[in-house]
Amino acid sequence: MKESVIRKLEGLLERNEEVMALLGDASVISDQDRFRALSKEYAQLEDVVAGFKAYQQAQVDLDSAKEMLEEDDAEMREMAQEEMKAAKAKLEHLEDELQILLLPKDPDDDKNAFVEIRAGAGGDEAAIFAGDLFRMYSRYAEANRWQIEIMSCNEGEHGGFKEVIMKVSGDGVYGKLKFESGGHRVQRVPETESQGRVHTSAVTVVVLHEVPEAEAISINPADLKVDTFRSSGAGGQHVNKTDSAIRITHIPTGIVVECQDQRSQHKNRAQAMSVLAARIQALEDEKRRSAEESTRRSLVASGDRSERVRTYNFPQGRVSEHRINLTLYRLNEVMEGDLDAILLPLMQEHQADQLAALADEQG
């Protein structure tokens, strides 16, 4: 392992011991904000510190085995050869693990996310599939103990959604769901199809990280056009009695957000503003990424969201993840929320890309 990497790991080990001591300090324990921040830092250091300690121990084992090679006893030398082989293999494995653990973390990965699902080509069938994807993400969120809140929805005439925006809250939400942005294509026989022909429909998914108030970019009120209108869709006697729905247009970017899920105009406006802030931030992030990564491929879909990322073929029970050429014949499980079968390989490929980029930078 490079000396510079060893030095970095030694610094993290030192910091880990420092944080551990601080967490036992009475003045820190009484300051809840500081205690919480240090606890989070300690948890983030845990894996890399454990990996480095295991690496150090493997290095000690290798050195001991080398010393045993000097023994006169042939049996001892043979044992030393075996121990050296095992220690070298362990060091190699741990070095790979530590390289991944040291990759720069996306600061947005721990944030909550807005998931926007929109029916594209395919009419009613696209809206029905948008509803299926909403259910799939809801199941996945449930399995991860995340919370879901519907921010806005426009139901399809025959089920599903023309558009639905959900907020997903919990640990590491954006880090996992960010790979879902892009075009999702479905191939299946609609219930109304009497000839049994397979139809192809499309749905686009956009995943944006939430922008906390403290980090929110400044939005000039003069740049906003705010319209109120009457809610449509489900809602019982309340519907059409008050102009509680909100449409906000950000004039400089042309971004439009509608929220009508809450009965209060104030709540709808607050929700619309949070989605608007996320979309504007995503636009800024995309500009920055384009400048930084103009020559590097990215598994996180580009800003136009038109890239086809996945196909769901119902007659064959097949899911094809086009970005990494992954094909799974586990369609039912995926639609029931078993997304890790796709997301984990995507994350691993993303890490491999990062490692390759890091190697290029280091020359």
UniProtKB/Swiss-Prot annotation:
This is Peptide chain release factor 1. SMART domains: PCRF. Residues 286-296 have a biased composition (Basic and acidic residues). It comes from Shewanella baltica (strain OS155 / ATCC BAA-1091). Belongs to the prokaryotic/mitochondrial release factor family. It comes from the Bacteria. It is found in: Cytoplasm. Residues 286-305 are annotated as: Disordered.
